[in-house]
Swiss-Prot record:
Keywords: Aminoacyl-tRNA synthetase, ATP-binding, Cytoplasm, Ligase, Metal-binding, Nucleotide-binding, Protein biosynthesis, Zinc. A motif ('KMSKS' region) lies at residues 263-267. One of its GO terms (biological process) is cysteinyl-tRNA aminoacylation. Zn(2+) binds at C29, C207, H232, E236. The keyword Metal-binding applies. Its EC number is 6.1.1.16. InterPro entries: Cys-tRNA-ligase, Cys-tRNA-synt_Ia_DALR, Cys-tRNA/MSH_ligase, CysS_C, Rossmann-like_a/b/a_fold, tRNA-synt_1_cat_dom, tRNAsynth_Ia_anticodon-bd. One of its GO terms (molecular function) is ATP binding. The gene is cysS. It is an enzyme of class 6 (ligase). Its cofactor is Zn(2+). Transmembrane segments: none annotated. Its main location: cytoplasm. This is Cysteine--tRNA ligase.
């Protein structure tokens, strides 16, 4: 089946047809590194990591570019307020974003260009726009002229006369609708030499130049948060048109993380930093939560919703841990016991439908429930093979979403949830099995009080006992 994605520009689902067969080129607007990241910032990283994973699962080679905006009005303001050099402020928060992406298991991009490293490319791009009659320099600033650019407004659907670029009038602007590509130097601010005088980049020219530098004049998909649709992405596309580039063939935008119906943002003061949220759940559980809603939907944050998502992930994790013990007879968490298998056709069908993750997760949990029923039966060779096949399907599906509990990224977390180190787990297994033997003897003698006492004591210690056809099994709660 062909992947269909919602193209913001077309306002409809479109079949994904890459420019080059077997290859996908993607540009994601990355972080403006002005502050530590909150969960709203990293949702796009998770959402489009899932896109990348799915394209790769379908056999495509993916070139994935995610930029860093390391020079910006907000960065300069924050650095000045904190009496820090702008470059140090930007570098500190770039590291914080990369830490957050790593914590959430987001695959590193093919390349992560910084704006400050691409000023020559921006200068060349602006010169092309000026030469083509769509831009001009005035008092050290360089402006683009939307009124002269074909199809301006195609992405946001706004009319030119009604647009607000969110800029001041600007020195030398010929038309208030023009937007800034390059800002003239100001005292105390970083500046670079250009044919029009010293200055620094505007926000929009950075991405147009970096995207085409690495992906060419035309590429497959441009991604980013819904809040970037206008003016940023509209102006990126306009600059590309003005320069003579085809630019992105598909535009994808993810919804916001909201609190009480409002977008999570520093200005509203309703942010939840990644370190603070990770005090409530494990990194993989936060990733599961951020990826669990459809990428175009708003994701309303609450601790209850976060907890429900974490519980959903743990059901998958617990099934795989139990499946390993069922197949091997050992409690050690060994991923090789359950090789990654084939994905069910129903899962692929849901993912091909504009990355319908909620429905895809429903498929995973249906398969987990099927597997759990088998785990309650006596472990015959035939039953073990069935469990391996089902577990392999679960792993394959979870891997696409970046939440396979037995993957290298999450294996240590899974081992810890299953009881810590192999040595500690082995010791605990001996002790618990001794208690379970005492309980079995009590049950055989119809000493129900003692049997219940053993079970209750184990429960108080965080150990859950499940009676199966092959005897009592135990696992750690939560």
């Amino acid at each position: 089946m062909t992947l269909r994605i919602y193209d913001t520009a077309a306002r409809q689902l479109r079949d994904f047809e890459p420019i080059r067969e077997g290859h996908a080129s993607i540009y994601l607007c990355g972080a403006t590194v002005q502050s530590i990241p909150h969960i709203g910032h990293v949702r796009s990283g998770v959402a489009f990591d899932i896109l990348r994973n799915w394209l790769e699962a379908k056999g495509l080679d993916v070139a994935f570019v995610r930029n860093v905006t390391d020079i910006d009005d907000k960065i300069l303001t924050k650095a000045a307020e904190n009496d820090r050099p702008w470059w140090e402020w930007a570098a500190t928060h770039e590291r914080a974003f990369n830490w957050a992406y790593d914590q959430l298991g987001v695959t590193p991009p093919s390349i992560e260009p910084r704006a400050t490293g691409h000023v020559p490319q921006m200068i060349e791009y602006m010169q092309r726009i000026i030469d083509n009659g769509h831009g001009y320099a005035a008092d050290g600033n360089v402006y683009a002229q939307p009124a002269t650019i074909d199809n301006y407004g195609f992405l946001s659907g706004q009319k030119l006369d009604e647009m607000d670029q969110g800029e001041s009038a600007g020195t030398g602007k010929r038309d208030p609708r023009d937007f800034t590509m390059w800002k003239a130097a100001k005292p105390g601010e970083p500046a670079w030499d250009t044919p029009w005088g010293r200055g620094r980049p505007g926000w929009h020219i950075e991405c147009s130049a970096m995207a085409t530098t690495y992906l060419g004049s035309e590429f497959d998909i441009h991604c980013g948060g819904l809040d970037l649709q206008f003016p940023h992405h509209e102006n990126e596309a306009a600059q590309a048109t003005a320069a003579g580039d085809g630019f992105a063939r598909y535009w994808m935008h993810n919804g916001w993380v909201t609190m009480s119906g409002e977008k999570m943002s520093k200005s509203l003061g309703n942010v939840l930093s990644i370190p603070n949220v990770l005090k409530l759940v494990r990194p993989v559980e936060l990733r599961y939560y951020l990826g669990s809603a459809h990428y175009r939907s708003m994701l309303e944050y609450s601790e209850a919703a976060l907890g429900e998502a974490a519980a959903g992930y743990r059901r998958i994790e617990k099934f795989l841990v139990r499946a390993i013990e069922y197949v091997t007879g050992e409690t050690a968490v060994d991923p090789q016991a359950l090789p990654v298998g084939e994905m069910p056709a129903q899962f692929a069908e849901k993912m091909d439908d504009d990355l319908a993750v909620p429905q895809s997760l429903a498929v995973i949990h249906d398969v987990v429930r099927e597997g759990n029923k088998l785990l309650d039966a006596k472990p015959t060779d035939e039953a073990k093979q069935q469990v391996k096949e089902i577990a392999g399907q679960v792993r394959a599906m979870a891997a696409v979403l970046g939440v396979d509990p037995l993957s290298e990224a999450w294996l240590e977390s899974t081992k810890a949830a299953a009881g810590g180190s192999d040595v500690a787990m082995g010791a605990l297994d001996v002790l618990v099995k001794a208690e379970l033997e005492r309980r079995a003897e009590a049950r055989a003698a119809k000493d129900w009080a003692t049997a219940d006492e053993v079970r209750d004591r184990l429960a108080e210690a965080g150990i859950e006992v499940t009676d199966t056809a092959d005897g009592a099994k135990w696992s750690l709660k939560g």
